[in-house]
């Protein structure tokens, strides 16, 4: 799918983060440095991090960072501190171990452990994944010609993951003749992948491997040329290489290097298989180059040169390119142009700009375009018949839902495969007939013991300080009484223009069945209500994200869904920034908060260009080397604004190998909170020492993490079972 934002599928969490420039450093002589580390004196005495003041100055503003030293993962004292925090977390949560086991067993029982995906037909093969009872990972398989044919195992993640604490397969690509498989593997969580190529006929790997790629690759149509992308020192994808199997010199050609640090480089292929596409993308602009996939030794040529603040996304059909662009269209418009004359002078508009409809992405097939829109905050599917020019909107059965297209690799199809879910409907795979407008359910994820009629969803709106209506999606068990006694989890994100749509979670049933309400706040900074919604929650408008979330919490309390002493909030990554900010602003409003890999040290990170993602995210948060952005970021950055006050109970998580949010951000924040907060409420830092941004990879290990978070909530709320 051609999509402007990396998909949040299906969880509301980001695929990017934030960072920025070098700052002036003022070293102060004669500072008394406290070189001590208080480890637990008793079973439940929290560790106290030592203070080594690091003094920085910019614009005449002097800042003291006592916990900068935690950034050095090579220092054994840093690792010892993280381990001490983990030991404290385990000790504090020890009374909940039986409850954690109960929750884990509940959640695991709901899973159909032996299962398979809906097969995807590519040429003469059916490709699918399956899981097996008791196994943590997926198995990639195919059958030739017929689903009754012999099964061929392509990748067994369980075997490849043996002996590893972390394992993830990134992208994988079947070669045009279906005899080779290229796939990428990450074994640390640092998101640096190794490319492997497997001979499927011999069931063996080639000796040729390529380390430290970004996880994506594409085949040319000759079946022996593969294109891949390498990182720079800041883990920014910036170089495109061409690798030819069995080439005599074994030296890969570097085809392009992107020197503008705001731009990431990617490689793709049109569904028509005609063109390879090199895309260059910042937060506010894009540029595409194309190459005839039949002639991989040729050079890429630019389609449309980059223009500041102009984005476009491209697909191909016959003699035309299709562009989704914000050129003179804040909410994007769809245009077409001849392949030989793609310039703006030759554009023909198919969908004009609209103030009320936001175009998020599109797919191109031989006879149809499928366009993914948002209208009044809800996703919508528009189908355009390329033979007639007519269009229609598809209908969905529930008032609040989420859907996104599957890969749909067949260019000639008239069946669009879509994934659908809601807060009460498990993941469902449909084939939608683009001609007859009918849909066929191919599979609905089985959830053992689940009865959807027992649960109810509702869409409600809070009102922000400036009068803006903020949508929320709620789910709870039928018969709920609005008596202010219900425990409630309020989830939020609000960044990068990504849309946090309602999603089904079988794990969440362990909350709903205990009387919880779950609420998803679609605050500004996301893209749920269009491009303006995003712009009103970024850069100098970022604080709208936080005040919107506070308005949502106040609304839920005012409407008697819950009370402040029953309200738990959660968010991850950039959503963790949201959590960190609101507990500084309104700690009285929440009983507990869960901040997963939270981006909380915004100012220091955005002032340091040696940290991955910093420069590219100036366009999201602002460049603090400019005074107005410095002042604004400093005014809300959670780490800078920790106060001497009472805080709600907090569970904070981190990943030692996280390349998006450095583990030291949650660690520093926790250390500062311990030193300054005036309460005895729980404060737990749990660092995964063998994973990165997304945490553990095994499906059952993940359940243990969820059980721990739920048990933390239950302990704080006084729920015993």
Segments from the language model and where they lie:
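Blade-edge beta-strand/turn elements of extracellular beta-propeller
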Residues: 157, 199-211, 247-259, 294-304, ...
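Glycine-biased, low-complexity coil/linker segments
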Residues: 22-27
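Mature N-terminal segment immediately following signal peptide/propeptide cleavage
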Residues: 44-95, 103-104
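Active-site-proximal cap/loop segments of hydrolase catalytic domains
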Residues: 520-721
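Non-catalytic accessory segments flanking enzyme active sites
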Residues: 80-173, 184, 263-316, 349, ...
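Polar, glycine-rich mid-to-C-terminal structural blocks
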Residues: 238, 243-281
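Asp-box/WD-like beta-propeller blade repeats and closely related beta-sheet repeat scaffolds
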Residues: 151-171, 182-230, 234, 239-241, ...
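Cap/lid segment of the alpha/beta-hydrolase catalytic domain
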Residues: 158-175, 183-191, 201-206, 406, ...
């Amino acid at each position: 799918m051609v999509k402007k934002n990396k998909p949040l599928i299906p969880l509301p969490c980001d695929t990017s983060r934030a960072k920025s420039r070098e700052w002036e450093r003022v070293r102060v002589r004669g500072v008394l440095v406290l070189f001590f580390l208080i480890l637990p004196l008793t079973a439940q005495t929290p560790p106290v991090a030592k203070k080594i003041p690091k003094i920085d100055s910019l614009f005449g503003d002097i800042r003291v960072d006592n916990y900068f030293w935690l950034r050095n993962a090579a220092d054994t004292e840093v690792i010892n501190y993280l381990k001490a925090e983990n030991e404290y977390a385990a000790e504090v949560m020890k009374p909940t171990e039986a409850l954690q086991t109960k929750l884990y067993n509940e959640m695991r029982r709901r899973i159909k452990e032996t299962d398979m995906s809906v097969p995807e037909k590519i040429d003469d093969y059916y490709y699918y994944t399956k899981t097996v009872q008791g196994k943590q990972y997926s198995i990639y398989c195919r059958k030739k010609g017929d689903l009754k044919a012999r099964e061929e195992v392509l990748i067994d993640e369980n075997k490849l993951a043996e002996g590893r604490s972390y394992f993830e397969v990134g992208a994988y690509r079947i070669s045009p003749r279906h005899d080779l498989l290229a796939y990428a593997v990450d074994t640390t969580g640092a998101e640096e992948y190794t490319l492997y190529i497997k001979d499927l006929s011999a069931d063996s790997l080639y000796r040729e491997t390529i380390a430290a790629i970004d996880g994506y690759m594409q085949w040319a149509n000759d079946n022996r040329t593969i294109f891949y992308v390498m990182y720079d020192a800041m883990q920014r994808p910036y170089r495109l290489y061409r690798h030819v199997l069995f080439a005599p010199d074994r030296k890969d050609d570097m085809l392009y290097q992107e020197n503008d640090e705001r731009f990431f480089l990617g490689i793709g292929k049109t569904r028509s298989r005609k063109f390879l596409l090199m895309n260059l993308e910042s937060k506010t602009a894009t540029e595409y180059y194309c190459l005839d996939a039949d002639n991989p030794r040729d050079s890429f040529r630019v389609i449309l040169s980059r223009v500041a603040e102009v984005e476009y996304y491209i697909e191909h059909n016959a003699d035309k390119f299709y562009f989704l662009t914000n050129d003179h269209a804040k909410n994007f418009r769809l245009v077409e142009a001849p392949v030989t004359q793609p310039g703006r002078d030759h554009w023909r508009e198919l969908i004009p700009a609209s103030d009320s409809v936001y175009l998020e992405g599109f797919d191109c097939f031989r006879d149809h375009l499928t366009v993914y829109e948002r209208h009044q905050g809800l996703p919508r599917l528009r189908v355009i018949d390329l033979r007639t020019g007519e269009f229609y909107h598809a209908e969905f059965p529930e008032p609040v839902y989420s859907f996104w297209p599957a890969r749909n690799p067949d260019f000639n199809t008239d069946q669009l495969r879509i994934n659908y879910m809601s807060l009460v409907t498990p993941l469902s795979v449909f084939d939608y007939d683009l001609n007859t407008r009918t849909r066929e359910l191919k599979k609905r994820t089985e959830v053992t013991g689940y009865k959807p009629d027992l649960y109810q969803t509702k869409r409600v709106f809070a009102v922000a300080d400036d009068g803006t209506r903020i949508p929320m999606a709620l789910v709870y068990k039928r018969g709920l009484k609005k008596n202010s006694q219900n425990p409630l989890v309020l989830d939020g994100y609000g960044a990068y223009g990504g849309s946090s749509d309602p999603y089904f979670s079988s794990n969440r049933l362990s909350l709903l069945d205990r009387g919880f309400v779950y609420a998803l706040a679609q605050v500004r900074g996301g893209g749920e209500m269009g491009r303006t919604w995003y712009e009103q929650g970024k850069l100098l408008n970022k604080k709208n994200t936080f005040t919107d979330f506070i308005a949502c919490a106040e609304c839920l309390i005012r409407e008697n869904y819950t009370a402040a002493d029953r309200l738990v909030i959660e968010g991850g990554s950039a959503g963790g920034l949201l959590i960190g900010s609101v507990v500084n602003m309104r700690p009285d409003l929440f009983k507990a908060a869960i901040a997963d890999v939270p981006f909380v040290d915004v100012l220091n990170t955005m002032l340091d260009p040696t940290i991955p993602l910093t420069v590219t995210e100036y366009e999201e948060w602002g460049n603090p080397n400019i005074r107005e952005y410095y002042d604004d970021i400093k005014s809300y950055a959670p780490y800078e604004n920790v106060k001497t006050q009472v805080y709600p109970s907090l569970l904070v998580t981190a990943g030692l190998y996280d390349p998006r949010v450095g583990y030291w951000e949650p660690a520093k924040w926790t250390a500062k909170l311990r030193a300054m907060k005036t309460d005895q409420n729980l404060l737990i830092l749990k660092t995964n020492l063998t994973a990165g941004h997304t945490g553990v990879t095994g499906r059952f290990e993940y359940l243990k993490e969820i059980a721990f978070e739920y048990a933390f909530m239950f302990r704080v709320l006084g729920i015993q079972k």
